[in-house]
Amino acid sequence: IPTQVTALGFIQLVADMKLEDNFIPLIIPAIAAPATFFYMKQYMESALPLSLVEAARIDGSGEFRTFNSIVLPLMKPAIAVQAIFTFVANWNNYFTPALVLHDDKMKTLPILIAQLCSADFLKFDMGQVYVTIAFSIFPVIIVYLFLSKYIVQGVAMGSVKG
């Protein structure tokens, strides 16, 4: 369901919970997004054979150890991909923060860039807009560079040795 469809109910919920001008209404839905859950479930079904978990149980491994030793290492590529997708989507999100955050100190970069561009057309400084856009790209690049090694490990783990 598009965010715009559920926006009115979301804003009413945020107001009822008195969470306006707070980052919590932006963080919680990002963590528990249905698309992320679906992708992780699909990846787990395709990359994690149940026989591996059953073999660990037969060998006497507990649930916690099985998860940490078998499931989590196999899920690292999917977790990295979803972390990148979620970070980029929320870093570039304009709509939801514009509805929830009203204090100027709480504004996100997309809102700041939009405000810079919507200032007086003849007087706003395009150089300032471009510098702000350049600074907004750096965290995305850093997150990608940090998490890309897990994606490469996942691709290498699935390759066939010759």
What are these regions (language model features)?
Residues 1-162:
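A structural signal for multi-pass alpha-helical bundles of membrane permease subunits
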